[in-house]
Amino acid sequence: MKALMFGWEFPPHILGGLGTASYGLTKGMWECGDMDITFVIPRPHGDEDKHFANIIGASQVPVAWRDVNYDYVDQRIGKVMSPELYFRLRDHIYADFNYMRTNDLGCIEFSGRYPDNLLEEINNYSICAGVIARTIDCDVIHSHDWLTYPAGIHAKQVTGKPLVIHVHATDFDRSRGNVNPTVFAIEKDGMNNADHIITVSNLTRQTVIEKYGIDPAKVTTVHNAVTPLSQELLDIKANKSPKEKVVTFLGRITMQKGPEYFVE
């Protein structure tokens, strides 16, 4: 099976759990066998693990035609994308995007993070998804979290292939009920257009069903797995007194992770 996956982070360059979860799921799918996975991120660094997924950076996807030769492309982006793929993608530019701000290769620059103009980057990412979907053959499209739902929808419209969205969290979780209407609309659009929805917990599944009005038959919970510790880590001995008690909160100090509940 050929899967076209859209994500926003991929190890080792991560800002939260989204990239780690995306990595684990992708690796697990590949280990099942007979899987050909293309994973798209906004901006790769070149040191991503590529042995189980083909990494494509939206920053290297041309959306405006530029007359450049092989050697120049190799010099500019050869560390993260082959010139052959660049030229294949260039052959599938589907509209005139010369009005957009692009670089000398006709590509849109992405921060690869969560900048103030995040909504603009999400829209630009979906434009790149249109070029990728016209170039890369796939059997299923998989979008990780709300940032990539527009890209997944665009790819589905281009290919006619089924779209699965992966809800790692909703804006109700991130904001504790103080929902951003723009984010909510993007999430709802993704859920409505998806052929199936994966949630990371039964609580998130209920939120999707109750808050977004989604048919329960369309939503499946798939819990995140745990990577077994290496023997090197298992061999580490505790450096504390047997009577000493240590309580640890392991997580970002954000509202969503609930450190205040932990302290209370």
Residues of each region from the PLM?
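Nucleotide-sugar donor-binding and catalytic loop/hinge architecture
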Residues: 1-2, 229-246
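Active-site proximal beta-strand in glycosyltransferases
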Residues: 3, 140-142, 149, 153-174, ...
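A short, glycine/small-residue-rich beta-strand->loop->alpha-helix junction that serves as a flexible
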Residues: 9-21, 47-50, 257
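A conserved catalytic-core segment of Leloir-type glycosyltransferases
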Residues: 32-133
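Nucleotide-sugar donor phosphate/pyrophosphate-binding loop at the beta->alpha transition
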Residues: 118-128, 161-164, 172-189, 228
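Membrane-proximal helix-turn-helix segments that form the acceptor-binding/catalytic region
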Residues: 130-135, 157, 180-197
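Conserved donor-binding/catalytic core segment of Leloir-type glycosyltransferases
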Residues: 198, 239-263
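Carbohydrate-associated surface elements
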Residues: 203, 225
